[in-house]
Curated annotation (Swiss-Prot):
Membrane-topology descriptor: Multi-pass membrane protein
Localization (cell): Cell membrane
Positions of disulphide bridges: 100-192
GO biological process, one term: sensory perception of smell
Job description of the protein: Potential odorant receptor.
Keywords attached to this entry: Cell membrane, Disulfide bond, G-protein coupled receptor, Glycoprotein, Membrane, Olfaction, Receptor, Sensory transduction, Transducer, Transmembrane, Transmembrane helix
Gene: Or5p66
Full protein name: Olfactory receptor 5P66
Amino acid sequence: MAFLENGNHTAVSEFILLGLTDDPVLRIVLFTIILCIYLVTVSGNLSTILLIRVSSQLHHPMYFFLSHLASADIGLSSSVTPNMLVNFLVERSTISYLGCGIQLSSAALFGATECFLLAAMAYDRFMAICNPLLYSTKMSTKVCVQLIVGSYIAGFLNASSFLLSFFSLLFCGQNIINDFFCDFAPLAELSCSDVSVFVVVISFSAGTVTMLTVFVIAISYSYILITILKMRSTEGRQKAFSTCTSHLTAVTLFYGTVTFIYVMPKSSYSMDQNKIISVFYMVVVPMLNPLIYSLRNNEIKGALKRHFDRKTFS
């Protein structure tokens, strides 16, 4: 049943997701494409985690953070993609009330965790380039673990604000969501209760995560740029900058899509455009991160080559 009587309200027990399209042919095409992307996402990020674990050359803070970033990528993609794939194959795309809350909070958890991990990686690059003599002390195992744990705690707090706000909403029968997953904005539009407080809570939580991590990344790279420009050796400049290009690319992709979805005025783009950008943010970007780091990072390419050479000659 979609609705259950609850006092003077009709409580919603499930939501109908309109998805990306109702064209049956296009649904099959999108199912195939997104399934392939998801398989590459999971296999690519798992490979990154395993490679960092087995390669002693990659037992450095940067790759410790990268392995957790890969875990967050799998979590972010898995919070939405499996349900979306199932919905491509059924005529009526639904998600239970509880499932909607879990999906919403999972996306908030891994999205925020990824923000803080990217900020931690920027701080790591700042210490490596601007304070190389203090790097081993300032980025000790204890500090790295604290940054990782802090990232997950921040993600959990962000997810809690989303989940508590969701369970505080009242729904009076309307249960059709014009999206492919349970996002807070369309859910707030469906609610028959006063959502102003919860919108402020969500905006504050998501805004704090974004602003704080962007600030850390911007300050870190400002100092990095100043330090690189002061280097007299061209080779030194190139080497220092090459260690940052992969991370900068990942940051640009991630925050570019986040800015489009959550910062730009809703009137500046259509709902269909928002869906496309959301797919890019939650499905495509998690696939691109391992490719970016493996293709642009010489240490990872070297570790991959040594690993395959051992496999070939063993």
